[in-house]
Swiss-Prot record:
Positions of the CTLH domain: 162-220
UniProt key word Disulfide bond: no
GO biological process: negative regulation of gluconeogenesis; proteasome-mediated ubiquitin-dependent protein catabolic process
Record keywords: Cytoplasm, Metal-binding, Nucleus, Zinc, Zinc-finger
Main location: cytoplasm
Native source species: Phaeosphaeria nodorum (strain SN15 / ATCC MYA-4574 / FGSC 10173) (Glume blotch fungus)
Cellular localization per UniProt: Cytoplasm; Nucleus
SMART domains: CRA (SM00757), CTLH (SM00668)
Cellular component GO terms held in the UniProt record: cytoplasm; GID complex; nucleus
Name of this chain's protein: Protein FYV10
Gene: FYV10
PROSITE patterns linked: CTLH (PS50897), LISH (PS50896), ZF_RING_GID (PS51867)
Zinc finger map (RING-Gid-type): 326-387
Coiled-coil ranges (or none): none
Length: 405
């Protein structure tokens, strides 16, 4: 159809927003593989030691009971290893299932030829559900996100469990004022954090030092000095070390910078935000919700100077013909798009002899005539190509010519 040629789908440009969709399974699979490798290496070393001890005991004509005890200990260790590997295998299977579903979801877009195809509408609704789940997870509404993912049957396309674990650690910092969970996470990802030059673990150790000094007392101050020597002295940041040492001479209620800032409870919020940014960087997740990115791009692409003009905006004139046509002029989006920049248009493309239908849509007259002739619209009447043959028909006298100033 003639009207579909101008609505051809470019799958590559659509998938720019969906790059993180495959990064998370990849990072999870890589981490799971390293965990399995670590478990096997550790267990192999233990098994080798146990086997050598059992062989040595048997060669010295040890009692049968002692030999059996050694063998039972080895079997127990092997059973523990088996359970750990089975758990890691189940996790790997789940990750592969999720990755396969995501690849299938992205491949579905390449099977769509036009923006007006019903399949594209279905695919877009699935993506919108994904973006909403991502937004809810980032805002901490994990239960609502899980229910939405389940109702839309997109559990394999979203990372509910990963975000739940992330926010558990974040809340332990922001609300619980505890560094234990975050330090466990740092230990689990120590190689990646060290490679990326992350300061998260150092900041957490510094907070532990601050809390020891805050408690006061000779015992706690001695613990603080030992802690600083063990965890802080290797940082190489002598300016920060100088400030940390200065805490020993000041109390939490002393209004002296920079020590009052180090003692401030707001540092816990700083640590929580630092953990979130570190977590998202590690798993190649964008710092902002994907819904924000999609909305910003969409609002910018549709926004025109007329949308917020005091003279021409339909938001200021309820009787405007564009009120139900322009999304930016709608009551819901007009104020939201006020500070969004205009799209950068390098060229304008206008069909020859443009005309506007009563519903506000503009087409070239030749394109409109060709479509209505092809679908067999009654002479003297026209239909909107987007609505198709089931759409409303208007008299040609209602079609107005468009003039571009």
């Amino acid at each position: 159809m003639a009207e579909l040629t101008s609505m051809k789908l470019n799958a590559e440009s659509h998938l720019l927003l969906d790059q993180p969709l495959l990064r998370m399974p990849y990072e999870l699979s890589r981490r799971n593989f390293k965990n399995a490798q670590r478990v096997i290496e550790h267990s192999s070393a233990n098994m080798t030691t146990s086997l050598a001890a059992a062989t040595k005991a048997a060669s010295k004509s040890a009692s049968p009971d002692a030999t059996l005890d050694s063998l039972d200990a080895m079997i127990s260790k092997m059973q523990v290893l088996k359970r750990k590997l089975e758990g890691l295998h189940e996790e790997e299977t789940r990750i592969h299932k999720s990755a396969k579903a995501r690849l299938r979801h992205l491949q579905d877009l390449y099977d769509v030829n036009s923006l007006v195809d019903v399949k594209y509408d279905e695919w877009s609704r699935t993506r919108l559900s994904r973006l909403l789940v991502d937004y809810l997870l980032r805002e901490g509404y994990s239960e609502s996100a899980a229910h939405l993912a389940q109702s839309k049957e997109i559990e394999d396309l979203v990372d509910v469990d990963a975000f739940i674990a992330c926010h558990k650690i974040e809340r332990s910092l922001r609300e619980g004022m505890s560094t234990s969970l975050a330090l466990d996470w740092c230990k689990e990802h120590s190689k990646e954090l060290k490679k990326g030059g992350s300061m998260l673990e150092f900041e957490l150790r510094l907070q532990q030092y601050i809390e020891l000094v805050r408690q006061g007392g000779e015992t706690k101050l001695v613990e603080a000095r030992v802690h600083a020597k063990k965890y802080l002295s290797t940082s190489g940041d002598f300016e920060l070390l100088r400030k940390a040492a200065g805490l020993l001479a000041y109390k939490p209620w002393d209004d002296v910078e920079p020590y009052v800032s180090l003692y401030s409870p707001s540092r816990w919020a700083h640590l929580a935000n630092l953990f979130l940014s570190t977590h998202h960087n590690l798993y190649s997740l964008p710092p902002r919700p994907l819904l924000h990115i999609a909305l910003s791009a969409g609002l910018s692409a549709l926004k025109t100077p007329a949308c917020h003009s005091a003279y021409t905006s339909s938001s200021a004139n309820a009787s405007s013909a564009t009120t139900s046509v322009c999304p930016i002029c709608s009551t819901e989006l007009n104020e939201l798009a006020r500070n969004v920049p205009y799209a950068h248009h390098t060229k304008s493309i206008v069909k020859n002899d443009p005309v506007v239908l009563p519903n506000g849509r503009i087409y070239g007259r030749d394109q409109l005539t060709a479509f209505n002739k092809k679908v067999g619209t009654e002479s003297g009447w026209v239909r909107d190509p987007v609505d198709g043959i089931k759409g409303e028909a208007w008299s040609e006298s209602e079609v107005r010519k468009v003039y571009i100033m």
